[in-house]
Amino acid sequence: MPRRSDLHRILVIGSGPIVIGQAAEFDYSGTQAIKALREEGYEVILVNSNPATIMTDPEFADRTYVEPVTPEFVEKVIAKERPDAVLPTMGGQTALNVALALHDSGVLAKYGCELIGANARAIRVAEDRKLFGEAMEKIGLRCPTGRTVTSLEEALSAVEETGFPAIIRPSFTLGGTGGGIAYNREEFETIVRRGLDLSPVHSVLIERSLLGWKEYELEVMRDCADNVVIVCSIENLDPMGVHTGDSITVAPAMTLTDREYQVMRDAAVAIIREIGVDAGGCNIQFAVNPTNGELIVIEMNPRVSRSSALASKATGFPIARIGAKLAVGYTLDEVPNDITKTTPASFEPVLDYVIVKCPRFAFEKFVSSDPGLTTQMKSVGESMAIGRTFKEAFQKALRALETGRSGWTIAERLQDDRLTEGSKEELRGALRRPTPERIFQLKRAMLLGMDTKELYEITAIDPWFLDQLRELIDAEQWYEKLTGVDAVSMRRMKRLGFSDRQLGALRGQSESDARAERWALGVRPSYKMIDTCAGEFPSSTPYLYGNYDEESEAATEGRKKVVILGSGPNRIGQGVEFDYCCVRAVLALREQGYETIMVNSNPETVSTDFDISDKLYFEPLSLEDVLEIVHREQPEGVIVQLGGQTPLKLTRPLEAAGVKILGTSPDAIDAAEDRRRFEAIARELGIEQPANGTATSVDEAVTIAQRIGFPVLVRPSYVLGGRAMEIVHDEVSLRDYFERAARVSEERPVLVDRFLEDAFEADVDALSDGTDVVIGAVMEHIESAGIHSGDSACILPPYLIPAAAVAQMKEHTIAFAKRLGVVGLINVQYAYKDGQVYVIEVNPRASRTAPFVSKAIGVSLPSVAARLMLGETLAEVGFTQEIIPPYISVKEAVFPFNKFREFDPVLGPEMRSTGEVMGIDDDFGAAFMKSQLAADNALPREGTVFFTVSDGDKPTAASLAGKFHSIGFSIMATSGTAAFFREQGIPVTSVLKVHEGRPHGVDKILNGEVQLLVNTPLGKHAQVDDEKLRQAAIANRLPYTTTLTAASAAFEAIAARRTREPVVRSLQEWHEILRAPGAVESATAGSTQPAGVA
């Protein structure tokens, strides 16, 4: 069938911020879908609140609305733009839930809008556990024994049928949020209550546990003519009980018999037909009983998913792109395969290689949280690797995680493998409970002589995988004993995925010595193409992976080449913002005629899409892998400053190996990162810093702290995301910090800074061509000093820091850029206190604010930076003047505290946010309100504000309580705070602290008597009370703030919401305002200063 001609305007709903369970894969999917629809001549409208995405850049969709992805705001966009259709399948669970809400409330019918890609019935039947179970029964397939319930009483009745352990799965949530495995009644009641609360329809499925069954996924596509293709099979290495996002996964499935696969395939085809997904793709999860092959259907996602992004990268079959074409009426045989250009999408992909995906976790950021892996997803990112065998791909995927392991290696310290003594008995206990370290504990168990049969009985990991892992140990032991290494034995080990570092360690060599030996033997990787057809048809897209076969399929062209190093797996501190920067650089350099070569290992991202760069190497970002690619490609140079800390760490070793680093020199990067060199430069430029010192021992740190005065900020050098950073108030706490968090030595110094309490902080992004410098933006942090810049909301342009101080920050930034010889991007962080500007740190690289600034000012900073690195000047690029918008942009952070309930959700100097959102409006209050709605922190319009604050905060809190009272809110406070408020004449209700008796503050929150919590940490003695309040707020989805500056901003937002409707404009319209004559000049003159919020 030809494309539908009755549709002209299509609204794509994005997924909003990066959260656990819904990450960069939806930027990738959405970007593909938008490109596919515009190719067909449709006008595309996008709603997405995440500024760090490529899809929200204004040139992708015709109209881009950076607005909250909520029914209310999507309705406003529909009312304004009047699209003919809504495509909800590219924005994860968020988009599906919003689309269904708009359908059910009659909004879509009112505006004559239809759902395409998946209709309302298909979404409802697939997502509603009860309806899905009934649909499976109708086609003769089994789901786990269980019952859908809407109350705790019903749940307790259901669990009598299923028994323990029981699985709890909430309906309509993402990443298993709110679900879990209960082994007893107490756990069961806790998880059910949470699941009912977090499910938008307040229903959960209670099902019989299938722990120990094997878990599989199929990616399936269907068109309007009822053609169905299976794109990819995926097998979870971990058995049922671990969320698929937290499991190591393998494609294609390895341990299914041919008959089992055919049964599963037939089931998948029957399922997609019965559910009614008739123009797009879906992901179907199955469990297989390892003893008799019995098949059970777990669930289906009627949309693109994390697994479909993985399947797309694994096969080269672009599921989202093809799904968008199917949604507008094409059939599979009418859509060409973009990789081969000669075969249609109705040809199922065939793999002649193996893919392994490994999840990346962030438990080090949430130390008190439970590292056990269950049905609720906890990983924050993932790596993918491609090899000729499972063993090769597995080791490469572990290396690509960038957690310090060079392959399947056990840690030097037992505690790093989550063990204390490493005995067989301890290992047996540890292996029964899935954690991120279990895969390494398995190696320890094998080295202690535990056999496959015993390990299978303990872990339920299929014996095939256990035997594959054992063969890696056998190979290590064989290699260790060789008297000499020749090319044959070296190639054998490389084909098993062993890195140079691993091979060196086995024979007492350094990594560089092992590499030199390998090169001397003439053993170097070849590169093969991913072509969707196992080499049956020629591939036109260079999408490559390294291996140690003799034959290479990578052709090298004669054009000038640039290698861009990506950022690897997403993690807290290094997220999709850096992928955005890499993609913008690639696109800018392609426009300038360069051959762009992307190196990355993250299957979720736009940068690893087959058509973004001229050539994609899907390889780990290790020195070994990058050196081999540079050796083969011989580029003009390598760009390291856009991918965060991952490529920056490679700067010095690459330079030492003779590789040209483009842009800012490695020496300048080192001068900014090395505290002693940086201090000397700041002194030379006459720029103030907080008093500080560098310690190489605990005693030295204590001496420095006593000299400069407590409180101090302590942190290791060369970290991203504030890793192991803390504010310390006394010597005892300082010594405790070194015991817990930081190993200190000459090679690993720790920085000790005087902490500037109650200072304002600001970020400045700028561009330099080596001679001239232009400010990109100055952003003021809403949270006060001491909270990591990545976790603080920020506003552009600044609103409380005096104009003279802002001007001084700009001057300092220009001075640093010139002194360091920056070519490309630079980010500088400042503090302002008592009339003095202090520099905190200088980063001569892309910062995580670059995408936000690019959206706010209408200029892509990374695109300009890439051209500067290749020798153009700011004047030649056309960016010669700072742009200060006449509107307000707010960036807000989004946190995963709902996944880590045991962790105290208080903000500090260590970054914990997973993503960000943006709010844009004409004034601060409305922009901040939008940012809170987008971050799922909806502020109340009325009700009770509960204050519990430290003594030093009481005067400011009283002023704020008075403001809330003046607009009709009731005020509640703990005794000390309440007494102070009464002295100021503020009506207030007293409430007990947790240790004072019942009913206390937590009871009030749990009973729904509080609509906003303002809680500033009260010091050690009240820590337990504080923590319980904040955890209750998280559990009850109650908006809360832990700083008074954020509470002031919340007041402004609530007041704005009560006085006017928010402005809904597309990004293109906001940028038109910038281009209006005199707009930027008037802004520069200070006309955009919003009302103060403190």
Swiss-Prot record:
Record region (Carboxyphosphate synthetic domain): 1-402
Domain ATP-grasp: 133-328, 679-870
Pathway membership, UniProt: Amino-acid biosynthesis; L-arginine biosynthesis; carbamoyl phosphate from bicarbonate: step 1/1; Pyrimidine metabolism; UMP biosynthesis via de novo pathway; (S)-dihydroorotate from bicarbonate: step 1/3
Binding site for ATP 2: 715, 754, 756, 761, 786-789, 829, 841
CC per GO annotation: cytoplasm
An example Gene Ontology biological process: L-arginine biosynthetic process
Positions of region (Carbamoyl phosphate synthetic domain): 553-936
Residues that coordinate or bind Mn(2+) 3: 829, 841
Cofactor note as given: Binds 4 Mg(2+) or Mn(2+) ions per subunit.
Binding partners and assembly: Composed of two chains; the small (or glutamine) chain promotes the hydrolysis of glutamine to ammonia, which is used by the large (or ammonia) chain to synthesize carbamoyl phosphate. Tetramer of heterodimers (alpha,beta)4.
Identification of the protein by name: Carbamoyl phosphate synthase large chain
Organism in which the protein naturally occurs: Gemmatimonas aurantiaca (strain DSM 14586 / JCM 11422 / NBRC 100505 / T-27)
